[in-house]
Amino acid sequence: MAKPLATAAASSFPPAEILEILTQVTTLLKSRKETISIAETACGGLLSSSLLSQPGASGIYAGGLTLYTLPSRVAYAGWTQETIANYRGPTTDIVSGLAKHVRRDLASTYTLAESGTAGPTGGNTPNRKPGYVALAVDCERGTFVRELNTELGGDRTANMVRFAVEGLTLLRDVINGEAKL
């Protein structure tokens, strides 16, 4: 017979760094009766699972896709072989396209999309260095983008958490009307 999980282990998710901004976002979405969908790559499901860990998630979460591989983007995000041939790593154009596609398909109020280089390895261009992330939130008002480097180097898990925090922060700013197109 399997042992039950310890209470401390069960309560350590979502990561503490995410919890404050996550609570702000879910409270806003619930109060406005709006919905969110997610298209994530480098976060690997962290955004969706964090949102789903919150009470009342079924009222705000329209769905999500973890589009980590290029073939998954062809299958689920409308990418073509031409898109793949021209792919040069994560950019704001890439995440804008993902956000628009997923919002259209899932009919959510907002879609948050992210794509980045979590590490530990990467490439030589700025958008392929560990810590780089491109973010987009698509909604009726337009597509809001942000890009940054976490400066966390090749710490894969720390980058994934920071990407999630930054994505949720952009989402909060868009919901509150504080983000600029």
Regions found by a protein language model. Give the residues of each.
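Short alpha-helical segments enriched in small residues
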Residues: 2-181
